C-alpha cells in the first residue's frame, strides 16, 4: 500500500472520533461542493412550481393517537355508547362502542370541534386544517409507521424528509437539511435515504422519545428525551485549531499524492469533504441548539420549566430555531400513544405534554412571520377503534383517522374529509398516505410524479404509482 495513502487513512480514523455520525451520516457525498459550490447536493434547487411552503415541521405522534377522543367529533358514538360495535366482528368479538372520554367543544370563528384535551391548541383552531379522512394499509405499528414515512410497508425506501431534501436542497450549507429529533429506536428507515445519496438522510438529534419513563431509565435505555444533542459534534481530544491543522495536513497529503501521480480515491476525497463541512457545523449546530439565549417569556410560552412540558417544549423551540437557520425538514417524535389500556390516564398525559408546546410553536412561528412559509404537521401512523378494548382502551384502526396541518399554504379552520358516524372508516375525501405524501410535496412545490430517482433500472418515487393531491386544502 502507498505509504502516503496509508497515512491519510490513519488521519481519517483519528478525526472520525470527533465528527462521528454528523460527518458520515448527514454529510456524505460532498465531493463536488468545494470545486463547484453551485453543484453541491444540498444547494437550493428550483421547485417544479411555486411553493406554498419552504420548510416542514412534522410532529410525529408515535403509537397512534385516538382520533375519536381528540379531533373527530362523533355525536352518534356518544348516543350509542355501550351498544355492540357494528364493525367489531372477528378479532373484536362482542366489543362495545365507547364514547369519547372527554367533552368536545367548538373553537375559533370556524367552529372547529376539538376535545377538552387541547385547551391551548384550541386557541389556534382557525389556523388548523383537519384531515379527518386519513387511511393507511395495515393496522400494525412497524409497517404503518414505515409507510407513514416512506410510502411502503415493508421495503427499504427513502423517507419523506429525504425526498424533500433531494428535491429542494436546503438554505444553510453549514447545517444538515433534514433533522430528526428523538427518533424511535431501531427506526432508521423513518429518516433514512435508502438508495438516495446518504447526504439526504436525516441527522439524528438525541435518542428515542419515551415519555413517562423515569429520568434514569430514559438515559439508560432511550438516551432520554432531554438528551437532544448531536453525537460527537465536539471533539474532546483536540481544540478547533488542532482540528483545522489536521484537515489542512490531510489536504496537503492529497495534493502530494496527486503530484506524485498516485491519484485520489473518490471515496476518501468525499469523506474529507464531509469533514470540512462538519468542521464548520461544529460552530453552527451548538448555537442553534443553545436555548439559553431565549427570553424567559419565550421559554415559559413553550412550557420550559414545567416538568410535564419541559422536554417537548425544548424540542419544539429547537425546531423553530432550526427553521430560522434555514433547515428544510425537521421531525420531532413523541412516543407512547398506543393506549390499548389506560386510555383515560395515558392519552391525557400525552396531550398534556404536547398541547402547550405545539400551541407555542404555532404562535411563535406566526409572530416571527415564519408560519406562512412553514408547514406544520401533527399526527401518527393510524387511529384507534371507536369501540373499547378491555375496560379502558382502544385497538388499532387504520381505515380512518385524523392528522392536521397548519401554515405553509393550507386553509385554516377547515375540516377535510370525513369518517362514518362512529369514526371507523373514511367515507368522504379519503386521504391515503400516498395522497398525503403527494399533498405535502405539492405544498413544497414538488410534483410527486416528477420527483424521481433512477435506481436498479427503474425510476422510483415516494408515491410509487399512486397519490392524488388534495388541492381543496390549499389556500
Briefly describe each language-model feature range.
Residues 1-475:
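Ligand-binding pockets and gating/stacking loops
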